[in-house]
A protein has these predicted regions:
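Short secondary-structure transition hinges
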Residues: 92-131, 152, 178-184
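Hydrophobic alpha-helical connector segments
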Residues: 72-100, 150-154
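Helix-turn-helix
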Residues: 11, 15, 19-53, 57
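Short alpha-helical scaffolding segments that buttress acidic/His motifs in well-ordered protein cores
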Residues: 88-91, 104-109, 157, 161, ...
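Short, basic, alpha-helical segments at the C-terminal edge of helix-turn-helix-like DNA-binding modules
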Residues: 60-65
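All-alpha amphipathic helical-bundle segments outside canonical DNA-binding/catalytic cores
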Residues: 82, 120-123, 140-158
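C-terminal peripheral helix-coil segments that are non-catalytic and often amphipathic
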Residues: 130-142, 160-200
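N-terminal intrinsically disordered/low-complexity leader segments
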Residues: 1-7, 18
Length: 200
């Protein structure tokens, strides 16, 4: 085989993404992925060489797509409330589609090499970030949201959005609910968060 098939490569990548981050099977083997994709294990090695390389690629792909959406969220022509609504939507959609992506990320935060990999390709737009902080302060001054440091506001927002997703297995067991019920709860989080954040 000398010519790579883009369709097959995408099939393997999408299958790996589902197994690793939708099903939470972080230790799945190339044989597991091949079986789920309906291809020979040799093809998985042909396209990605190893299970670890495939894992790293699909994780990076998911992370990059998430940050790209966040960058689009802070476009200046949108109102502050719309930006926050979009941020919640983006986070919730990813959390429902790939519930174990954030879980894996949190589990690796004490690994210096992983932290370096997470940040080395992430070039923040300082001007855009500063403008967003300025918007937060303006909303506080207008009385739309509670006054605090902008970073505290963002931390509160991140916690309210991500906590249920990261704690999903525990919450499902503690509340005696299934995946369908949990997704309904998550779907209602947006309105609950907006009511908590905005004073008017």
């Amino acid at each position: 085989m000398s010519i790579k098939d883009g369709h097959t490569e995408k099939l393997i990548r999408d299958t790996a993404m589902r197994i690793f981050f939708k099903e939470g099977r972080f230790h799945a083997t190339t044989q597991d992925i091949a079986d789920a994709a309906g291809v020979n294990r040799t093809l998985v090695h042909y396209y990605f060489r190893s299970r670890d390389i495939l894992f790293k690629q699909v994780f990076e792909e998911g992370r990059t797509a998430f940050f790209k959406k966040l960058d689009e969220m802070v476009q200046p022509e949108q109102s502050f409330r719309v930006k926050i609504e979009h941020l919640i939507d983006i986070w919730m959609e990813q959390g429902i589609e790939y519930p174990f992506l954030d879980t894996y990320l949190v589990s690796q935060l004490n690994n210096p090499s992983v932290l370096e990999e997470l940040t080395e390709n992430r070039v923040d737009n300082e001007d855009r970030k500063a403008a967003f902080y300025k918007e937060i302060k303006a909303e506080m001054k207008a009385g739309s949201i509670t006054k605090m440091e902008p970073m505290q506001f963002l931390l509160n927002l991140a916690a309210m959005v991500s906590y249920p997703i990261i704690m999903r297995p525990l919450l499902e067991r503690a509340l005696s609910i299934d995946e369908k019920d949990f997704n309904k709860i998550v779907a209602g989080r947006k309105e609950a968060i907006l009511k908590t954040i905005f004073l008017k």
